[in-house]
Amino acid sequence: MEERQTFVFSATLTMVHDIPEYLEKKKRKHTKSKIQKLTPAQKLQKIMELVGIKNPKIIDVTKKSGTATNLTECRIACTIDHKDYYLYYFLKRYTGRTLVFCNSIGCVKRLATLLGILDCKPLPLHASMQQRQRLKNLERFQADENGLLIATDVAARGLDIPNVEHVIHYQVPRTSESYVHRSGRTARAQKDGITVLMMEPSEKEYYSKLCKTLGRTEDLPMFPVVDRLLIATKERVEIAREIDKLELKCRRDNSKKGWLRKAVEEMDLVLEEDEENLAAEMEETATLKYQLKKKKHQLASLMSKVLFPKGFSGKYPDVNLEYKLNDDNQKAIDVMKKVIEEIPKKEKERNKKPHIKRSSFKTKILRKKNRNKV
């Protein structure tokens, strides 16, 4: 038998973190002993035993940060309701191949529907899809230089998609490994890339654990967003949400009516109030369709206009100096790099400001008394 070599590669082989709460609770039911956190060496040993490798040679080139040096990391802090605004803002403001990660299939489906209504041409990818459809969406994503793929962690590993410029974590990943592998879809083959972590208040705990595991002593820098441009996206997203709700209601009503009519026909039943109910149903359906048509017309009217206006604004001159609107050459990574470069300068300027010592209330009274005596 010829000699055979087996190689095992991973960006997170030596990464260790605290045991997730759900796993700790599950283990407590079966054992009373406390679960010990593995060291990197112990973790590697267990992997070698599972794989069945004899006399392994370990080469660890993992960096402390866990991510590539040419990857720019940042975050957006917002409420859960505003995530859609920020995501749509980013997609419309910065062109390029973008991969959006979600924690659940339900979230992927919702975003794909919403962004589809907004004409962003999203391509969903999750485990519930047929393999043929998954491969088809991946091919479409690779063929479009401004492609948008919305996926679960099924796309976080094992995929080498060239020239992915942006990775957006729509939800904070539950583990540090997921964050590293998701972010690793960009900044590949010595190319630059940017990863944006969207964080709501309830996800702060997962964010803190992520920073702790990756050895981050400081928060990820904030991605710059022009507030007045963000406001322009809100109206579109809100109308798209309403359209989504109306379409869902129409589908449910049609499904319910179809099932009821089919059951009545199969059992040869005659409903006394059939005509009255039918008239009421038709009126309700007509109302829903009218509302849906009205909202679609309203959205189409907004979509026909320029989202981010060109030119100089006299009301907000400082905004125009800092951010050029509708600049096709403007890249998200360049904007973020500029912000990161300015952070030390701003801190230095802040430290240079003279500290004004405020006099206490008692000192003021004494000074007043002394003036009166004079």
Name what the model sees in each region:
Residues M1-E3, I19-K34, T113, I117, ...:
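Arginine-glycine-biased low-complexity disordered regions
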Residues V8-L13, T62, C102-I105, T152-V154, ...:
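A short beta-strand-to-loop transition that corresponds to the Sensor-1 phosphate-sensing loop
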Residues L138-R157:
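Conserved two-lobed SF2 helicase motor
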Residues E2-F7, R97, K121, D144-L148:
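Loop/turn-to-beta-strand initiation segments
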Residues R157-V172, G193-M198:
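A short beta-strand element within the Helicase C-terminal
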Residues N103-N137:
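Conserved helicase motor "Helicase C" RecA-like lobe of SF1/SF2 P-loop NTPases
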Residues M1-D60:
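Post-DEXD/H (motif II) to motif III coupling segment of the RecA-like Helicase ATP-binding lobe
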Residues S65-I117:
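Conserved interdomain hinge at the start of the Helicase C-terminal
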